């Protein structure tokens, strides 16, 4: 895990979607953490929304962002568990052109050190769609911190070697 100091640093435009039946944007600590973290790294917040745990509302928002040339990365938080209404994987997986299986695998490995075997109930996932990277993480602020600090931050750093996702997301207007 090295950084190429000679590589130009490119910052990306990121949209955040919180999926919750109980939060508002004012009480959404997970989305607020992600926004602060991405801005501290120099990335730009393209948009931020909150929807209830409804497959069609999630698809509508994410599909709009996938088509938007101003959105290069999407991070969703919430809806990845096993309760009756958790439906982020069912809503968003069909939108992926390519699945990034290693994301969920690595998240659960990192999460195991924090919450033990409860990590098997995480259905977090990631994929690429129309040159947009999409990361779907659990709704707890702790899980968002694990995903950001352990995986997403480095993968959105264009100087991170041997590879990163910045090289896979392209400005759609080009």
Give residue spans per PLM region.
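Non-catalytic beta/alpha edge segments that cap or flank active sites
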Residues: 1-174
């Amino acid at each position: 895990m090295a950084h190429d100091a000679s590589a130009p640093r490119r910052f990306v435009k990121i949209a955040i979607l919180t999926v919750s039946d109980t939060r508002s944007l004012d009480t959404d600590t997970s989305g607020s953490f992600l926004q602060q973290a991405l801005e501290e790294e120099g990335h730009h917040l393209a948009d931020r929304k909150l929807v209830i745990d409804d497959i069609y509302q999630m698809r509508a928002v994410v599909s709009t962002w996938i088509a938007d040339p101003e959105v290069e990365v999407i991070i969703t938080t919430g809806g990845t568990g096993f309760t009756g209404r958790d439906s982020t994987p069912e809503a968003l997986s069909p939108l992926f052109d390519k699945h990034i299986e290693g994301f969920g695998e690595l998240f659960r490995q990192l999460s195991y050190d924090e919450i033990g075997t409860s990590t098997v109930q995480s259905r977090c996932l990631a994929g690429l769609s129309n040159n947009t990277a999409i990361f779907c993480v659990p709704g707890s602020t702790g899980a968002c911190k694990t995903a950001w600090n352990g995986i997403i931050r480095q993968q959105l750093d264009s100087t991170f070697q041997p590879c990163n996702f910045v090289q896979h997301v392209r400005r759609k207007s080009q």
